[in-house]
From Swiss-Prot:
Chain positions found as Phosphoserine: 77, 284, 403, 442, 627
Post-translational modification Omega-N-methylarginine, affected residues: 599
Protein name per its UniProtKB record: TNFAIP3-interacting protein 1
Residue numbers of Phosphotyrosine PTMs: 552
Chief subcellular location: cytoplasm
Stretches the record annotates as Interaction with Shigella flexneri ipah9.8: 351-367
Gene name per UniProt: TNIP1
Any coiled-coil regions, as ranges: 20-73, 196-258, 294-535
Species name: Homo sapiens
Length: 636
């Protein structure tokens, strides 16, 4: 039915109007094309469902093989416990039935297939039948089996970590070092076991992650195939739609051709053409009545058969639509549950990892505390041992020093006793010449003699002390006098240097002023030569007042002595120097100022020969130097 086109029904006319027959034919063609599209889509869905079921069966077989390999591993010892709750979830849920493997026959019974372990990803599809949906006992039993081992694993891990904490506390509080190392060895064994268990759990986790990644890739491949099938279905539907449009166009063109053959070209001939066609049809009815009845019966049978097929296809399509929607809903629900389970497991794994890291940090901290305590005790022990050794050496050294001192003391005591005896004998033998004869044998005379000798000795001692004090006093006096002399000499040198510095500063300033005056005079000469005019040149103030009568050779700048820096801040008027003056102009007049009395920089004694000079002939400059007395009195 799919490979052949629509049935062509020959209608000679007379029984059914041509318009109704063409409309029914078009309806049948449309229904046929629509049913073809639905059948093709249903076929593609069935093929995709079969492929997905085959992939799911293959994945379940792989998961069962992994579970068997996991069960073949040696069981862990009860003392160690378990640290991987994910490994216990791999072989528990295995009694859930799958969907039927023949999607084209919905009346077949589903066969039970074992379910793979939950990988924690959204790529694991599971077909759930309505019986399983209505049985909450099976789902609750599966969930209980899936999440059952977690408390046991957690309890074993807590027991193992409690044992480690107990061992650490005992190790930290143990005073005996031998028992301490025993506890440390036991803790090392426990850590070795825990490390092996963690390594096994990491291997299992890596296997499960690989399986989850493989399932995810296969799920993506299935999704890609499904999308590709949907695209092919859409393309086929579009192609059938285009064929339907082409058929419609052919039918319309055939109808137009039949209408055009009955009319010559004008709209007025349409009614006459129709009447002629009706007359011809009525004439042909009488001619071929028997074959017309046979053709109509065959056409009716075919129409009934097509209607029956259409109703069956609609029913099948409805059933497949319901089944597809239910399967889609079940898959979505399963994906949601698996995602929720994956989120819960990831959260649980994160909590366990955080708890393990916290306990590991606590254990490391306790271990470091115990280690630091042991090191401190060993350091204290070594320090005490070193101190004891040092004290022993010190005691031995003091004993070695004490023995000669003891011998020396004994020797000195013996010598003192011998000297006392000799002194007593000498005192008993010697008698003073000035003492009366009655006092020789009396004890009062001996005591007076002893006192006299003591006074004489004390007097001699005092004389020697006075002599020493006198020598010290004389030495200090000579040192003081020498220091005063040096001080006076230094002060004189400082005064002389200060005077020289002051004089050199004054001369330097005078030289600067003279240079400025010469420069001004040169400028005036240049101006006079440039203008060519005669004018009266005013005399320079220094020229009128005259120069300072004393001239000294220039001296280098002196650095003041240490302690007399503030003396260099005293400024005195500079001595004016003789300057070269140009010859007076012919019409100029010289004004002679009265004599000016120059004063010395200080208020000392003034030399009458140097009191004043008149600057009439400014050619001569006195060269008599200032007395050393004035130089010395200047800075004072």
């Amino acid at each position: 039915m799919e490979g052949r086109g629509p049935y062509r029904i020959y209608d000679p006319g007379g029984s059914v109007p041509s318009g109704e027959a063409s409309a029914a034919f078009e309806r049948l063609v449309k229904e046929n094309s629509r049913l073809k599209e639905k059948m093709q889509g249903i076929k593609m869905l069935g093929e995709l469902l079969e492929e997905s079921q085959m992939e799911a069966t293959r994945l379940r077989q792989k998961a069962e093989e992994l579970v068997k390999d996991n069960e073949l591993l040696p069981p862990p010892s009860p003392s160690l416990g378990s640290f991987d709750p994910l490994a216990e979830l791999t072989g528990k849920d295995s009694n859930v039935t799958a969907s039927p493997t023949a999607p084209a026959c919905p009346s077949d019974k589903p066969a039970p297939v074992q379910k793979p372990p939950s990988s924690g990803t959204s790529s694991e599809f599971e077909v759930v039948t309505p019986e399983e949906q209505n049985s909450p006992e099976s789902s609750s039993h599966a969930n209980a089996m899936a999440l059952g081992p977690l408390p046991r694993e957690d309890g074993n891990l807590m027991l193992h970590l409690q044992r480690l904490e107990t061992t650490l506390s005992v190790c930290a509080e143990e005073p005996d070092h031998g028992q301490l190392f025993t506890h440390l060895g036991r803790m090392a064994l426990e850590f070795n076991r825990l490390a092996s268990k963690v390594h096994k759990n990491e291997q299992r986790t890596s296997i499960l992650q690989t399986l989850c990644e493989q399932l995810r890739k296969e799920n993506e491949a299935l999704k890609a195939k499904l999308d590709k099938g949907l695209e092919q279905r859409d393309q086929a539907a579009e192609r059938l739609r285009e064929e339907n449009l082409e058929l419609k166009k052919l039918l319309m063109s055939n109808g137009n051709k039949e209408g055009a053959s009955g009319r010559p070209g004008s709209p007025k001939m349409e009614g006459t053409g129709k009447k002629a066609v009706a007359g011809q049809q009525q004439a042909s009815v009488t001619a071929g009545k028997v074959p017309e009845v046979v053709a109509l019966g065959a056409a009716e049978k075919k129409v009934k058969m097509l209607e029956q097929q259409r109703s069956e296809l609609l029913e099948v399509n409805k059933q497949w639509d319901q089944h597809f929607r239910s399967m889609k809903q079940q898959y979505e629900q399963k994906i949601t549950e698996l995602r929720q389970k994956l989120a819960d497991l990831q959260k649980q794994v994160t909590d366990l990892e955080a708890e393990r890291e916290q306990k590991q940090r606590d254990f490391d901290r306790k271990l470091l505390l115990a280690k630091s305590k042991i090191e401190m005790e060993e350091t204290d022990k070594e320090q005490l041992t070193a101190e004891a050794k040092e004290l022993r050496q010190k005691v031995k050294y003091l004993q070695d020093q004490l023995s000669p001192l003891t011998r020396q003391r004994e020797y000195q005591e013996k010598e003192i006793q011998r000297l006392n005896k000799a002194l007593e004998e000498a005192l008993s033998i010697q008698t003073p010449p000035s003492s009366p004869p009655t006092a020789f044998g009396s004890p009062e005379g001996a005591g007076a003699l002893l006192r006299k000798q003591e006074l004489v000795t004390q007097n001699e001692l005092l004389k020697q002390q006075v002599k020493i004090f006198e020598e010290d006093f004389q030495r200090e006096r000579s040192d003081r006098e020498r220091m005063n002399e040096e001080k006076e000499e230094l002060k004189k040198q400082v005064e002389k240097l200060q005077a020289q510095v002051t004089l050199s500063n004054a001369q330097l300033k005078a030289f600067k002023d003279e240079e400025k005056a010469r420069e001004a005079l040169r400028q005036q000469k240049r101006k006079a030569k440039a203008s060519g005019e005669r004018y009266h040149v005013e005399p320079h103030p220094e020229h009128l007042c005259g120069a300072y009568p004393y001239a000294y050779p220039p001296m280098p700048a002196m650095v003041p002595h240490h302690g007399f820096e503030d003396w260099s801040q005293i400024r005195y008027p500079p001595p004016p120097m003789a300057m070269e003056h140009p010859p007076p102009l012919p019409n100029s007049r010289l004004f002679h100022l009265p004599e000016y009395t120059w004063r010395l920089p200080c208020g000392g004694v003034r030399n009458p020969n140097q009191s004043s000079q008149v600057m009439d002939p400014p050619t001569a400059r006195p060269t008599e130097p200032e007395s050393p007395k004035n130089d010395r009195e200047g800075p004072q």
